Amino acid sequence: MKKISSPSFCIAKVIDEIVGYMEQNQGNNKSGIIRELHESNRLLPYFNKIESDYLDAGENLQSLISKLEQSDEVLGIEKSKMKELYKTFYSSESSFRRDLYKLTPRCCPICDAEWGYATHTLDHILPESIFPQFAILPINLVSTCYRCNHSKNSIVGYLESQGVLNPYFNSVNLLPYLKCYTYIKGDDFITHIQLKNESVVGLDPLKYKRLRFFYEEVYKLNEAYSEVARVSVLNSLIDTLSELGDVTNDFIKGDFQSLIMDDKEDLISKGVVTLEFLKVLVLESLQDLEVEAYDLINRMLQERRQMSEVQDIF
């Protein structure tokens, strides 16, 4: 997770647009209370204050939410109506949403999935279902992929050992901490992309717990990366090897080793979890397996070549 640029607009601009809309659409079910709060000079000062508190907490948002009480309303505005304000003023046609999307032009800042393979959404870092006061706050809205958004759902790290990571303030280079564990089940490989053990990563215990909470509990990246490794990376390796003709176990192992040595350090320095990096992790784990792993690879190669022959005839 790389740190990204903060939004170019603040809550005052959002409130200004909301107030202007409500003044022109007084039949709206939220118009009365919004105009009343605005005219009594309570609306903008309140949201300016929570934005300021959020920014002050910054990379330690857990310290902010530990002081907050959960509420079903904000200045008398029901939680459901705060959600409606978000849906209206951050709709797919909204300039606010477009501006936030521009902050992550290439990929999801959480899992590094590239757009085109993943779909943009806006994620409430502090969930609107729990903290409605942050529902329309720009600094609480991050452009992430659909999978990360819905994996997180309403999970919040209230404890110091859990924490809350927001890409506007925090960054984590996951690559040095990841390892692939592969084993054979039946006639297939099972892969798990997991965090290395605490004893070998060199982090203090609190940071390691926060990293594990982020990786496994909040965004479930272990599940996402493991699935990609099994379905995409392994299949791609088999496809590539199947085009080489007959290969020995020693050839396969040597080919794997050269790919690992050539790529790993450069990939880690970039700090992005790409297919190439996952491939290196898978190759490392395959090298740790016994000869039966290479026998299974050769059987898979034979099956893949037979499939290719059938496809060519078809």
Model-derived regions, located:
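C-terminal, charged low-complexity interaction regions
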Residues: K2-S31, G202-F314
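Short Cys/His-rich Zn2+-coordinating modules
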Residues: E84-R97, D123-I130
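Short cysteine-rich loop/turn motifs with clustered Cys
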Residues: F96-H120, C145
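Extended hydrophobic/Leu-rich segments
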Residues: F47, L61-L68, M82, L159, ...
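Glycine- and acidic-residue-rich phosphate-binding/metal-coordinating active-site segment common to enzymes
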Residues: G116-G202
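Soluble regions of membrane-associated proteins that transit the secretory/organelle pathway
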Residues: I4, S8-I11, E36, S40, ...
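N-terminal accessory alpha/beta regions
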Residues: M1-E93
